Structures are given as C-alpha cells and as structure tokens.
A protein has these predicted regions:
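Extreme N-terminal, non-catalytic leader segments
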Residues: 1-7
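Conserved substrate/cofactor phosphate-moiety recognition/catalytic segment
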Residues: 23-67
Length: 174
C-alpha cells in the first residue's frame, strides 16, 4: 500500500468498533506486503494490568503507547493503534511525536456502544461497579479535526472498512 510508515490511531468509545476495524486493517496491510503492528488497548492492558483509569493514568498510558508507536514508525513499521484515548490533549501529544499520524475517529453513539457491550462493562459502570468509565462517569472528548471519521452506527463493518481503505489509498497515492 505504501512505503512510508505511518501511525493509524483509532479512537472512540468502548464498543465503537475500533478493534474490529484495526484488526481487519492489519490483515489487509500485511497481505499487501506492508510491515505493520497492532497496538490494542485491551491487549496492552493485559500485559500491564497495573495501569489505572484515572485521567492521569490514562494520559500517561496513551503517551507511552504513542511513544512506542512513534519508535516503530521511525523504524519503518506502520502502527495500527486502537485505544479509547479519551482526551484530546494526550492524542495531540501523540500526533506531535509521529511523522505521519492519521487519526481515525470511530464515532458511535453511547446507546449503540451499550447495545454492543460484549464485555458487560457498561452494565457494570451503570451499576457503579466500575468507576471512571469513559462515556458514563468519565468524559470522552471527540477529536476536533480527525483525518477520518467512521460512523459505525450507520455502516456495516464492510462499509466502514471500505471507507477506511479508500481514505488510506487516496492519501498514500498523493
């Protein structure tokens, strides 16, 4: 697809479809011969379970992952990153670290995310069993100017993916 590495950063609420699209994109890029790695919020948190959910913890976590993504990018590896990354300031910090940063906002209504709640996290947050849960009792700050917005409420996974690949093809052929 491209010879220049980039960081493709998916952001959005839990259950928006970030990981689904990110995993599909990694397969697509690898099949196209592109060197790439997936950094996924759930996977990384399983490796580092001590990472908390306070604003400070989340900011530090996103910045660490951004630093890792920028290192991989510098070494010619495209990074597909899937993190809720709820705060604009930390996403903007990551953007500045990366040479070729593409922010993909997976815009999905809270209602849709709650319907998709395969992990049961929204139910636990609504019952007060989980606190500082993004979208319930902790804010999500939508990007102001993402390179791409995908609205998974209104699109199938395939439609969203085609929109994503179409955008990436268009921007890499310029």
């Amino acid at each position: 697809m491209t010879e220049e590495a980039r960081v493709i950063w998916f952001t959005g609420l839990s259950g928006a479809g970030k990981t689904t699209l990110a995993e599909k994109l990694v397969c697509y890029l690898k099949n196209s011969g592109e060197k790439c790695e997936l950094l996924d919020g759930d996977t990384v948190r399983n490796i580092f379970p001590q990472t908390g959910f306070s604003k400070k913890d989340r900011d530090e976590h996103v910045k660490r992952m951004g630093f890792l993504a920028s290192m991989l990018e510098r070494n010619g590896i495209t990074v597909v990153a899937s993190f809720i990354s709820p705060y604009r300031e930390s996403r903007d910090f990551v953007r500045k670290m990366c040479k070729n940063f593409i922010e993909v906002y997976v815009s999905t209504s809270l209602e849709t995310c709650e319907k998709r709640d395969v992990k049961g996290l929204y139910k636990k947050a609504r019952k007060g069993e989980i606190t500082s849960f993004t979208g319930i009792d902790d804010p999500y700050e939508p990007p102001l100017n993402p390179e791409l917005t995908i609205k998974t409420d209104n699109e199938t996974v395939e439609e969203s993916f085609e929109k994503l690949v179409g955008y990436l093809d268009k921007t890499t052929s310029q």
